[in-house]
């Protein structure tokens, strides 16, 4: 091992949402003098306004700190800040691959949560040295010993050296830094070997093109060097190298073991995929870094501008977003009801919310979003397999041999008193119980297989409400399973409205159709003629509601007199309404599309 690297430590921080990860990062930066008190602002590494507001970390960030340890040596610490949310699990695994150690932050008042566990298992898979920290000990409800036991029982880590700390009050920060220096191993790697580096994040800078965050494992990268990206064999010339300390500054080279920024004439962020391997074009390394995969979106929804004139603006906004987010996909789509728009793909629900919120906030767009749907796998009668992300594209019933839907394995951590309510919720969502184990006397871990389509709507909100906010959820994709699914069409006056169709389980179709029709009846305004709202599977109508017509009294000016005169007027009115119904089109208000989303309740 090169003696050169013995002063470098690469580590990340693992924590559940709100356990104080970003605050701890702020304190570490202040303690090492990387950021002066004047520059410090809360959640220093969460650059996006949205990240600060929701208190979550979305993109990975890095920062290099200089630290003089108690043994008098100077160390270079690279903190790689990872997103904690399960939607970004792949980004987390790539950030972990770039480290040798991790600080595990556990809230002294809450104990170990589902996402903490999921990330810890990933860290253990990457053989990281884990330094446990029990945070928020300044709170009156903190139970340090209890949490220490829980870390030992639930995760199986030896927690006798766990550092009690309070990131908010700055207690225990020095001790954490000492532990990093003494427990996390220095990186290995030979600066003379062929170049091998992993990209663990990339984003688009309007002046320099794509900026890649990399960790160099072998070799050295210098400006003017020709590099090659492994997954697509494209070659680029390195223009500049840099590090964040915490503001960007240029460096002359990055050697094995170091973490930094590479800018190399890359124009498209989709070329610099997270997890890809960079090597020297002239002297490539033997094998790429294992575990690279192209992230596939799991949840889809249509996004349409309310004003048709905003279409171009929406397209520009989506293009800019996708520059920074290689997991986000979009393609144009048209809908009879909503006009022109885009079909967007996301990693999960949080990702979807964030993208939509950024479109509305950063680009000031007013949007309609259709109900989220998942990717179904359809095998038709000829045996061809096709993946469908939009219910409107489903082939007719008689051509489908089998339909499969994605299933998730969900791990739910909860208090023992909420178990009943949670099991009931999972049962309602067609879940299949796999495991239930008690962690100590107060907490329980429940494992279920649940179809993704059932989780997409509001499973998370419901879970939080039945457990009074105490349950936490972590999930991974298990694979596709065959299910008895049907496409439910909504017809208005006999015309199908594509944006309202949904794919549902056959057992639920009747109930769902009835609910939908009732909802729509409330939101579609009255017309001069009656409007029929029907829910149908194929040609079979399973539910119907009618919006009654306005009634105009055409007989008001007939006093007494002959019945035939009155009949003539009534017939004439009836004719008029019939003609109107043939040519009239029903305006479907924005609320109708939202009604589809709310039907679940």
UniProtKB/Swiss-Prot annotation:
Signal peptide: none annotated. Belongs to the TRAFAC class translation factor GTPase superfamily. Classic translation factor GTPase family. LepA subfamily. CDD domains: EF4_II (cd03699), EF4_III (cd16260), LepA (cd01890), lepA_C (cd03709). Residues 6-188 form the tr-type G domain. GO terms for biological process: positive regulation of translation. Required for accurate and efficient protein synthesis under certain stress conditions. May act as a fidelity factor of the translation reaction, by catalyzing a one-codon backward translocation of tRNAs on improperly translocated ribosomes. Back-translocation proceeds from a post-translocation (POST) complex to a pre-translocation (PRE) complex, thus giving elongation factor G a second chance to translocate the tRNAs correctly. Binds to ribosomes in a GTP-dependent manner. It is a peripheral membrane protein. The keyword Oxidoreductase does not apply. HAMAP family: LepA (MF_00071). Coiled coil: none annotated. It is found in: Cell inner membrane. GTP binds at residues 18-23, 135-138. Keywords: Cell inner membrane, Cell membrane, GTP-binding, Hydrolase, Membrane, Nucleotide-binding, Protein biosynthesis. This is Elongation factor 4. It comes from Anaeromyxobacter dehalogenans (strain 2CP-C). The keyword Calcium does not apply. It holds the Pfam family GTP_EFTU.
């Amino acid at each position: 091992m090169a003696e050169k690297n013995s002063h470098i430590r690469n580590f990340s921080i693992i924590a559940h949402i709100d356990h104080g990860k970003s605050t701890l990062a702020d304190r570490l930066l202040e303690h090492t003098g990387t950021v002066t008190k004047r520059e410090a602002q809360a959640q220093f590494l969460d650059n996006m306004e949205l990240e600060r507001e929701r208190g979550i970390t979305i993109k990975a960030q890095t920062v290099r700190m200089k630290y003089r340890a108690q043994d008098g040596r100077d160390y270079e610490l690279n903190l790689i800040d990872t997103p904690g949310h399960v939607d970004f699990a792949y980004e987390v695994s790539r950030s972990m691959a770039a480290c040798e150690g991790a600080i595990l932050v556990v809230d002294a008042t809450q104990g170990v949560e589902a996402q903490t566990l999921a990330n810890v298992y990933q860290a253990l898979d990457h053989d990281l040295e884990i330094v446990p920290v029990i945070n928020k000990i300044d709170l009156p409800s903190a139970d340090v010993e209890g949490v220490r036991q829980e870390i030992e029982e639930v995760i199986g880590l030896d927690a006798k050296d766990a550092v009690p700390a309070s990131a908010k009050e700055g207690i225990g920060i020095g001790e954490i830094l000492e532990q990093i220096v003494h427990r996390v191993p220095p990186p290995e790697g030979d600066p003379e070997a062929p170049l091998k580096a992993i990209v663990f994040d990339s984003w688009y800078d309007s002046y320099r093109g794509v900026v890649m965050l990399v960790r160099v494992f072998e070799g050295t990268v210098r400006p003017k060097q020709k590099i090659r990206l492994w997954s697509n064999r494209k070659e680029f010339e390195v223009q500049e190298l840099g590090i964040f300390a915490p503001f960007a500054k240029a460096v002359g080279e990055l050697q094995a073991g170091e973490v930094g920024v590479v800018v190399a004439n890359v124009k498209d962020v989709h070329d610099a995929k997270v997890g890809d391997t960079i090597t020297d074009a002239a002297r490539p390394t033997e094998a790429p870094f294992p575990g690279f995969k192209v992230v596939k979106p799991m949840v889809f929804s249509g996004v349409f501008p309310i004003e048709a004139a905003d279409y171009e603006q929406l397209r520009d906004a989506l293009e800019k977003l996708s520059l920074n987010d290689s997991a986000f996909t979009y393609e144009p789509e048209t809908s009879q009801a909503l006009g022109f728009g885009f079909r967007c793909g996301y990693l999960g629900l949080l990702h979807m919310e964030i993208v939509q919120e950024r479109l509305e906030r950063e680009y000031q767009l007013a949007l309609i979003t259709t109900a989220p749907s998942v990717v179904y796998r359809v095998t038709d009668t000829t045996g061809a397999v096709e993946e469908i992300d939009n219910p409107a594209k489903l082939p007719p019933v008689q051509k489908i041999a089998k339909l499969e839907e994605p299933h998730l394995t969900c791990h739910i951590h909860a208090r023992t008193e909420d178990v009943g309510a949670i099991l009931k919720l999972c049962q309602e969502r067609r879940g299949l119980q796999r495991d239930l184990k008690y962690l100590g006397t107060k907490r329980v871990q429940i494992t279920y297989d649940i179809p993704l389509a059932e989780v997409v709507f509001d499973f998370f909100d419901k879970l939080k409400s039945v457990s009074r906010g105490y349950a936490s959820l972590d999930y991974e994709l298990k694979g596709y399973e065959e299910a008895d699914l049907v496409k439910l069409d909504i017809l208005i006056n006999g015309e199908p409205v594509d944006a309202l169709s949904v794919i549902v389980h056959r057992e639920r179709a009747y109930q769902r159709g009835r609910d939908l029709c009732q909802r729509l009846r409330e939101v579609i305004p009255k017309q001069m003629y009656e409007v029929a709202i029907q829910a149908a599977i194929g040609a079979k109508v399973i539910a119907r509601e009618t919006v009654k017509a306005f009634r105009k009294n055409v007989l008001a000016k007939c006093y007494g007199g002959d019945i035939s005169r009155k009949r003539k007027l009534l017939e004439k009115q009836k004719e008029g309404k019939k003609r109107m119904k043939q040519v009239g089109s029903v305006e479907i208000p924005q609320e109708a599309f939202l009604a589809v989303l709310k039907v679940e309740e």
